Amino acid sequence: RGRGPEAFWQSAVWLRTAFDDLRHEAHAVVAAGDIVVIHATMSGTHSGPFVTYDENARVKQAFAPTRRSFAVSHTHWYRMSGGLCIEHWANRDDLGMAEQLGWIPPTPAYLWRCRRARRAAQTAHRASSIN
C-alpha cells in the first residue's frame, strides 16, 4: 500500500491484472463539506491470479483464476482538499465476491490451483525485486 496518485494507479493495475473486464457503475454520488461518497456496483470476470500482499509487501495469498463473473455493491468515501483526494475509505462486499467467484467454499482442486498460483506469484515477486 502506498500514497498518492502512483499508489492509486498501481491499485487499478493490480485489480485489472485479476479482472480484465473490471467495471464500476455509480448509482449515487453525494458531497457534503469536504466528503464525497460514491455508492456503486463493481463487476468483472476473474481472468488472472488475484494476489494479496502482507504488510511487508510479500505475497500473502493468490486466488487462481476461476473465469467466473461477479457483481458486488461497494461504497467509497473520499476526503477532498484543494480539489484533490487526501483520504479514501471503502466498504465492499468481499464475502459476496468470494462466493460468486467460487473462492469459498473452496474445492480441494481449487485449493491446489491457489497454492500453485501463490508459488508463481512469489517467484515473480522475487524476480521483480531483483531487477
What are these regions (language model features)?
Residues 1-131:
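C-terminal and inter-domain tail/linker signature
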